[in-house]
A protein has these predicted regions:
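Short N-proximal segments of mature Sec-exported proteins
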Residues: 27-90, 110
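Residue-level recognition of short, well-ordered coil/turn positions
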Residues: 17, 40-41, 96
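Sec-dependent N-terminal signal peptides
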Residues: 4-16
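Sec/Tat signal peptide C-region and signal peptidase I cleavage site
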Residues: 16-22
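Substrate-binding/catalytic groove segments of enzymes
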Residues: 59-66, 97-99, 118-119
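Cystatin/cathelin-like cysteine-protease inhibitor module
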Residues: 88, 92-93, 97-98
Length: 120
């Protein structure tokens, strides 16, 4: 009985190691550009809008105004969503060094350069 418990414990330990080595697939900038390029299918357009909106909304929701100065300041009236996405696609295509980087971070960097905050 003790041998069975030892074997089960060893299997449990090794299965945890196998799971710990699993890599998480992150959407690359090139993959996002491929989805956001026009003309886009309704599915691609929906994914592109959903992803970029979620990244921006997450930035807004998680930035604590007293602890972190804003780095994206969209002036009102804001430009059309399609205009911003089109500018992002152009930015990514002209900066191929970001093609394999995570799309969320590159999109935030683009937004920061496109909509900088006034320096005080």
């Amino acid at each position: 009985m003790k041998k069975v418990l030892v074997v089960l414990a060893a299997l449990a330990a090794f299965s945890g190691l196998a799971q710990a080595q699993e890599t998480i697939k992150v959407l690359s900038t090139q993959e996002l550009v491929n989805v956001c390029k026009l003309p886009a299918s309704p599915e691609s357009r929906s994914f592109c809008i959903g992803f970029t909106t979620a990244v921006y909304e997450t930035y807004l929701a998680t930035r604590h105004p007293q602890r972190a100065k804003p780095f994206i300041c969209v002036k009102q009236p804001a430009p059309a969503r399609d205009e911003v996405i089109g500018d992002f696609v152009k930015f990514a295509q002209s900066n191929q060094q970001v093609a394999e980087k995570p799309a969320a971070g590159v999109f935030l960097g683009f937004m920061a350069s496109r909509f900088p905050c006034a320096r005080k």
